[in-house]
Each structure stands twice: as C-alpha cells, then as structure tokens.
C-alpha cells in the first residue's frame, strides 16, 4: 500500500503519467470537505490532465451540534465552489446515509454535478479485545451490497439530469447488467479486480456482450433505465409497501418454529 499513499504532489504526477500512458479518460478522485483548499487542488488535478473529477466527500458528523441541514449545505457549497473552479465534469460520490437521498441528489444536480456515484463505502474501525486498541479493518465489497445501490439508482434516474454510477458490489457481468437496467450509465469495480486480477474485466465485457446478443439489445444505451422505478409495472417494489411481499417470499420449512 506504500505506492497508494503518494501524497498530494505524487498524486498529481500519477494523473499526469496516466494521461500520457492511456487513450481512455482519466478520472481523478478528490477527497475533500472544506471548499477552499480542495477547490484549488481540483484545479491542479485538471491542469495535470484529469478528464473529470470524482469528489469523494468523506465527512462523518461526530458532533451532535452539527445538523443535517448544515452537513448537506456543506456538500452543496463544496460542489458549487469546485464547479466554479474547473471546467471538467465533476461527479460526487454519495453516502447512503442521508435521511432524504433523493433531495440531496437533486440539489447536487442543480449546482452542476455531472455524475452521482452510488455509494461510498465507509470503512469502520474494529476493536482489538486483547490490546484494547481501535484498529483499522479493510473489507472488500461483496455482491450483496449491490442491492442498495440498484434500489436508489432505479429511483434517482427518473429525477436527475446527472449520470449515475454504481460502485460497491459490482463483481460480474450480471451485476453490470442489473446496474444498467436500474439506470446507471457507469459501473465501477475494484474489489473483484484485486481478488482476480485486471484480466477479469475482459471476462466481464465478454459476458456482457454475450448477454446483449442473447437478449437482442443493440447497445447498453438501449436498455439503460428500463427497470427504473417509473419503468417497471409495479413501482411499489421500490417502496416500503413491498416489505410484506419480501418477507412472504422466504421459504419456511415445515415445523421451522416448532423447536
């Protein structure tokens, strides 16, 4: 992980080197909270060659005096400031923990966010019960995490102009298909590439092309959003009213509770 922790100047060099080495767009990730310094660093990323910037706002409100209104205003102000500083597209990596995700998504869309990334994965500390220390724990994503992202992509795609990206739980071509059907224009994967190697991406693309042919789609654009909340016959599948249907779908064995 030493190569990963490059520092600010090293990261700018990495962006410049990547831009010179590849023919695909280079999207730089910016971790920030306060508008001033981070907006300036966004400008330096653009100068280094970044084709777009993903703003990863990792803010944990540990102070009980900080209200949800203040926190959300900080997000919106930060995106507005960075949009005024750079000309390249800016995407925002969202947390799933907003009380009204659709509202904050719409507000970020209104101030110019070109993309919304669903969702950030916050790494939680663990307790070492022998040393009584708080220790970091890195856990790679699992396909089960995809369901929350599909849920909100299917809702948000009908309400925002920004492109949607899904990250967290994308491991296979089937996962990619689900993301696109929900309304995502972009799917991201990292954990499975760390586990299986970069060559796994080529297998996913091959399987995706096969699926498109078998289901007679000419392109991914044709299917994008075809299972959004507005597009499906039963929109309540994305709402609280679907709760009992989900529970009743679980197959209970005879005598399951008679023990």
Q: Which role fits each region the language model picked out?
A:
Residues 215-227:
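A glycine-biased, small/acidic residue-tolerant capping/turn segment at secondary-structure junctions
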Residues 196, 231-234:
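A short beta-to-alpha transition loop/helix N-cap that caps and shapes the active-site region
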Residues 193, 227-230:
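A short, acidic, flexible beta-alpha connecting loop/helix-capping segment that sits on the rim
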Residues 185, 210-214, 229:
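Short, well-ordered loop/turn and helix-capping segments at boundaries between secondary-structure elements
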Residues 1-2:
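Short glycine/proline- and acidic residue-enriched helix-loop micro-motifs
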Residues 125-142, 194-217:
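C-terminal helical cap(s) of enzyme catalytic domains, especially alpha/beta-barrels
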């Amino acid at each position: 992980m030493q190569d990963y922790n490059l520092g600010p100047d090293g990261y700018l060099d990495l962006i410049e080197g990547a831009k010179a080495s590849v023919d695909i767009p280079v999207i730089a990730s910016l971790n920030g909270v306060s508008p001033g310094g981070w907006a300036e660093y966004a400008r330096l990323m653009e100068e280094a060659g970044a084709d777009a910037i993903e703003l990863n706002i990792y803010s944990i409100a540990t102070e009980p005096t900080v209200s949800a209104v203040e926190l959300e205003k900080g997000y919106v102000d930060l995106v507005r400031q960075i949009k005024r500083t750079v000309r390249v597209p800016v995407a925002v990596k969202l947390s799933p923990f907003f009380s009204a995700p659709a509202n904050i998504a719409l507000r970020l869309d209104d101030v110019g966010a070109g993309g919304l990334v669903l969702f950030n994965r916050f790494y939680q500390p663990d307790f070492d019960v022998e040393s009584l220390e708080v220790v970091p724990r890195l856990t790679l994503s699992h396909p089960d995490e995809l369901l929350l992202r599909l849920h909100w992509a299917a809702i948000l795609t009908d309400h925002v102009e920004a492109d949607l990206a899904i990250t967290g739980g994308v491991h296979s071509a089937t996962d990619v298909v689900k993301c696109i059907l929900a309304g995502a224009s972009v799917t991201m994967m990292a954990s499975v590439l760390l586990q299986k190697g970069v060559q796994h991406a080529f297998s996913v693309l091959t399987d995706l092309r096969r699926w498109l042919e078998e289901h007679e789609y000419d392109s991914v654009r044709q299917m994008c959003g075809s299972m959004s909340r507005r597009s499906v016959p039963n929109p309540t599948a994305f709402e609280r009213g679907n709760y009992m249907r989900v529970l009743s779908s679980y197959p209970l064995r005879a005598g399951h509770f008679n023990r």
